[in-house]
Amino acid sequence: MGFADLWYSHPRKYGQGSRFCRACSNNHGMIRKYGLNICRQCFREYAKDIGFRKLD
């Protein structure tokens, strides 16, 4: 049993550890609204492609 098996052996079905960014697999700074499930860094990169636009 290696270190990774011990460290991540607990099942992650709910909570912050269960959600990952669909673009980069990061789990920090998640935007879950509207079912985006994307981290804030990737959102800034892909927002225009998704259809969001900045309002002045």
UniProtKB/Swiss-Prot annotation:
Cofactor info, note text: Binds 1 zinc ion per subunit.
Residues given in the record as Zn(2+) binding sites: C21, C24, C39, C42
Matching Gene3D superfamilies: 30s Ribosomal Protein S14, Chain N
Gene Ontology CC terms, in alphabetical order: cytosolic small ribosomal subunit; ribosome; rough endoplasmic reticulum
Obligatory cofactor(s): Zn(2+)
Single GO biological process annotation from the record: cytoplasmic translation
Cell compartments where the protein resides: Cytoplasm, Cytosol; Cytoplasm; Rough endoplasmic reticulum
Keyword Ribonucleoprotein: yes
Ribonucleoprotein is among the record's keywords: yes
Main location, first listed in the record: cytoplasm
Annotated GO MF terms: structural constituent of ribosome; zinc ion binding
Pfam family, one: Ribosomal_S14
Membrane-spanning residues: none
Keyword field: Cytoplasm, Endoplasmic reticulum, Metal-binding, Ribonucleoprotein, Ribosomal protein, Zinc
InterPro entries: Ribosomal_uS14, Ribosomal_uS14_CS, RIbosomal_uS14_euk_arc, Ribosomal_uS14_sf
Assembly and oligomerization: Component of the 40S small ribosomal subunit.
PANTHER family: 40S RIBOSOMAL PROTEIN S29 (PTHR12010:SF2)
Entry's family note: Belongs to the universal ribosomal protein uS14 family.
Protein name: Small ribosomal subunit protein uS14
